[in-house]
Swiss-Prot record:
GO MF entries: rRNA binding; structural constituent of ribosome
UniProt-recorded name of the protein: Large ribosomal subunit protein uL4
Cross-referenced HAMAP family: Ribosomal_uL4_B (MF_01328_B)
Residues covered by region (Disordered): 45-73
Leader sequence residues: none
Assembly behavior: Part of the 50S ribosomal subunit.
Superkingdom field: Bacteria
Family label: Belongs to the universal ribosomal protein uL4 family.
Tagged with keyword RNA-binding: yes
Cited function: One of the primary rRNA binding proteins, this protein initially binds near the 5'-end of the 23S rRNA. It is important during the early stages of 50S assembly. It makes multiple contacts with different domains of the 23S rRNA in the assembled 50S subunit and ribosome.
Gene, per the UniProt record: rplD
Amino acid sequence: MELVMKDAPGALTVSETTFGRDFNEALVHQVVVAYAAGARQGTRAQKTRAEVTGSGKKPWRQKGTGRARAGSVKSPIWRSGGVTFAAKPQDHSQKVNKKMYRGALKSILSELVRQDRLIIVEKFSVEAPKTKLLAQKLKDMALEDVLIVTGELDENLFLAARNLYKVDVRDVAGIDPVSLIAFDKVVMTADAVKQVEEMLA
């Protein structure tokens, strides 16, 4: 199959299996959820009644005081007592095998093509690491919410994009399912397309 180049005459021949496959919504959902789960820190921690600071002594005798019976100042009912079902650090990551991950990326790329959200260019760069230059270039291309994918990370481009809201620059190794679906448009250089095909082959 062929994809039209935005900044050059002619078209780029690409793999049908990478850019022309059916959209597998269930697979994409599973991989995106797993990716987001893996990004969770999972470091929250609370103390149970066994872990909070305090004496093990019974605060007052069982009977005769008129007060409610109490066996420990560390009871969850008490102020500064332990938490009944205390949250503990945990690993939220989910296993996704390589075949599923690659399949999800292919599904997303194919859907981007179908929705005319994938823009192929011969090259994409700025002369200097200036936000103003990149902002003008994107304005000329009528792009606002965009992910720019290049074969190799262009430092000028990366620095120019840092201060632009809804603009991100990645190299091929840095793309993931979440970033590909998070932006309205994805601009990809011809070199990046070839690298993506090799990566997902």
